[in-house]
Curated annotation (Swiss-Prot):
Belongs to the universal ribosomal protein uS12 family. Pfam families: Ribosom_S12_S23 (PF00164). The lineage of its organism: Archaea, Nitrososphaerota, Candidatus Cenarchaeales, Candidatus Cenarchaeaceae, Candidatus Cenarchaeum. With S4 and S5 plays an important role in translational accuracy. Located at the interface of the 30S and 50S subunits. This is Small ribosomal subunit protein uS12.
């Protein structure tokens, strides 16, 4: 292995060597090449709109036993399909196929799945422009198209 240059005027060479070595650090490489943004279906944005394709039930991981209510959503911006969780009791009753929904991340670490719902990284917070929370608690009615 070649030794690092020493001496008074070795700064430029040392700097260039450090720059080359940084590419072996995986975090640096992912950040510089934008791999996390490319892998993210929402393209790095915090929220996205989509069309509901179907309602699905996702089984919870062990030791819990439940069917978590989710929907398959096709994003408008790039056509990618994602699974989004429906928070709160009875939220599934307010969502039909072909509704327009707004989705956001679930808030888990590193953008991953949260809690006992495997493979679900996003949640629905609006249906046809109305807050899902307000629909569930009965403050607002779902607008008819």
């Amino acid at each position: 292995m070649a030794k690092s240059p020493l001496g008074l005027f070795a700064g430029r060479v040392l700097k260039a060597k450090k720059k080359r070595q940084r590419w072996s650090i995986s975090r640096y490489k992912r950040r510089e090449l934008g791999l996390d943004r490319k892998a993210n279906p929402m393209g790095g944005s915090p929220q996205a709109r989509g069309i509901v394709l179907e309602k699905v039930g996702v089984e919870a991981k062990q030791p819990n036993s439940a069917v978590r209510k989710c929907v398959r959503v096709q994003l408008i911006k790039n056509g990618k399909s994602i699974t989004a969780f429906l928070p709160r009791d009875g939220a599934m009753n307010f969502i039909d196929e072909h509704d327009e929904v707004h989705v956001e991340g679930m808030g888990a670490t590193q953008g991953g799945a949260m809690g006992d719902i495997p493979g679900v990284r996003f949640k629905v917070f609006k249906v046809n422009g109305t807050s899902l929370h307000e629909l569930v608690i009965g403050k607002k009615e779902k607008p008819r198209r």
